């Protein structure tokens, strides 16, 4: 009797495992196919650069994504601007050979613009995309209408140079393990998801009342997966961010710094340094905003970006 139970249990476990892995591989294949479908690859003077371009406006916002990420980690276009989002070197279909340092990556974005025939952009650097956006704004004032630093990294911190076993474990994690954790979070429901993602209870409740922004946060979370096709860029970012020396004081274009008071991933001091060192920079502080404030404070931030964009373009055109 016990032998039969054991055999049936083993068969059941084998079938369940086969179904789970079968679904996982189908999910991963479909996910990557969709990523590729929603992007293009430009052959530039510096190599292949993957990008997405959405919206209809003549004005372009060049969005430089965070760590880790890709062209799928971006923002929605508005009636005022299109959004161009390259996959940074080492992420998705942009090889790391295109540029490792922030300066090299800035040159790559200029090569992308040249390839696409785009003469001017407003550049926005989000989180780990901040260093390359800073270097771009400093090096190409004739191409840069203005610079927006959104929860952006601006300098190295001593803590980043120490061994961080949690980050190391994440860097070495498997696609399946991360997928399983994400699927489990979704299975547990929205309350469990926002509690895990957002430390601030006020932001948790705000997001639970806004299904659209809750969905946007889920998309942002999935923009770090599969890690295997983003890992090379992720590792490079860690190496670069441990020893940053950026040309902040060389930036001469209009600059807006947007940072949240509750950001525990990129401390507000990073944004304050940009506002202090960039001549005539303006700082917009999002009270209670964490690193995911584009979901929890979306209307406030979108309005700040559009107002800055419009005032800058109107000033240049006057």
What are these regions (language model features)?
Residues 50-93:
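Conserved HGGG/HGGXW glycine-rich cap/lid loop of the alpha/beta-hydrolase fold
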Residues 104-122:
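Conserved acidic catalytic loop of the alpha/beta-hydrolase fold
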Residues 120-161:
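Conserved hydrolase catalytic core segment
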Residues 167-169, 180-246:
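Alpha/beta-hydrolase
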Residues 232, 262-266:
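Acidic catalytic loop of the alpha/beta-hydrolase fold
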Residues 251, 257-259, 263:
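Short beta-strand/loop motif that positions the catalytic acidic residue
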Residues 253, 267-276:
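Short alpha-helix in the alpha/beta-hydrolase fold that links the catalytic acid
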Residues 281-318:
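Catalytic active-site module of serine/aspartate enzymes centered on a nucleophile-bearing elbow/loop
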């Amino acid at each position: 009797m016990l032998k039969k139970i054991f055999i049936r249990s083993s068969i059941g476990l084998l079938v369940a495992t086969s179904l789970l892995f079968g679904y996982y591989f189908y999910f991963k294949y479909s996910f990557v196919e969709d990523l590729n479908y929603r992007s293009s690859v430009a052959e530039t003077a510096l190599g292949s650069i993957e990008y997405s371009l959405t919206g209809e406006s003549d004005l372009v916002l060049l969005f430089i994504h965070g760590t880790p990420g890709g062209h799928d980690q971006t923002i929605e276009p508005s009636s005022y601007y299109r959004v161009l989002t390259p996959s940074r070197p080492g992420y998705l279909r942009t090889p790391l050979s295109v540029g490792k340092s922030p300066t090299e990556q800035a040159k790559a974005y200029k090569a992308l613009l040249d390839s696409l025939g785009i003469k001017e952009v407003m550049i926005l650097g989000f989180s780990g995309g901040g260093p390359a956006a800073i270097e771009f704004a400093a090096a190409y004032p004739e191409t840069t209408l203005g610079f927006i630093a959104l929860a952006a990294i601006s300098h190295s911190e001593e803590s980043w140079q120490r061994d961080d076993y949690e980050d190391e474990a994440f860097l070495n994690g498997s696609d399946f393990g991360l997928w399983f954790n994400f699927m489990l979070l979704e299975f547990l429901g929205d309350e469990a998801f926002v509690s895990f993602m957002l430390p601030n209870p006020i932001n948790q409740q705000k997001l639970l009342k806004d299904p659209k922004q809750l969905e946007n946060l889920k998309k942002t979370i999935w923009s770090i997966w599969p890690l295997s096709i983003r890992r090379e860029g992720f590792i490079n970012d860690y190496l670069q961010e441990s020893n940053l020396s950026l040309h902040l004081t060389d930036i001469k274009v209009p600059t807006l710094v947007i940072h949240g008071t509750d950001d525990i991933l990129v401390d507000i001091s990073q944004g304050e340094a940009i506002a202090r060192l960039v001549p005539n920079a303006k700082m917009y502080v999002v009270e209670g905003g964490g690193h995911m404030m584009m979901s929890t404070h979306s209307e406030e931030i979108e309005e700040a970006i559009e107002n800055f964009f419009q005032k800058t373009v109107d000033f240049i055109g006057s």
